Amino acid sequence: TQILMDSANQDGSILVGTGDLSELALGWATYNGDHMSMYGVNASVPKTLVRHLVRYYADTCKDEKLTEVLLDILDTPVSPELLPPKDGKIAQKTEDLVGPYELHDFYLYYMLRAGFEPEKIYRLACETFEGMYDKETIFKWLKTFYWRFFAQQFKRSCLPDGPKVGSVAVSPR
């Protein structure tokens, strides 16, 4: 990150961060690594919205090659790995470690925007995701969400500036 910032300063440009609201809420970033930039363009955009936007553009794009690339991105598991794996498979899949982002984004919205207690969020999640996740899985990832959200606050206390796109954000400003 420091090398990228130095390079940006030499060019008179800025280092734009790609971390999204979901990653910031869970603290799923390396402190002063990918967590730091000069402007966090996706800081208030949840990962599930990013996926929907990419899907929409892939479905409406007239460029077949770009559509193919976008669909490949959507089919690739979320991972912090930066280099191609040696055996051709991604070893570290983020959602295997922290849980499904669609659940975390749901929890985040109802905690921050609606101000609901964990018990109510759990009940709503059980109804909303019935048939997709069992109650034990929903509860497991809800506990993980709350633990990570509060344990990782220190990373959000020093975030770079970024836009507020929707009604939910975790910026300390």
Regions found by a protein language model. Name each.
Residues 1-173:
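ATP/NTP-dependent adenylation/nucleotidyl-transfer catalytic domains that generate, transfer
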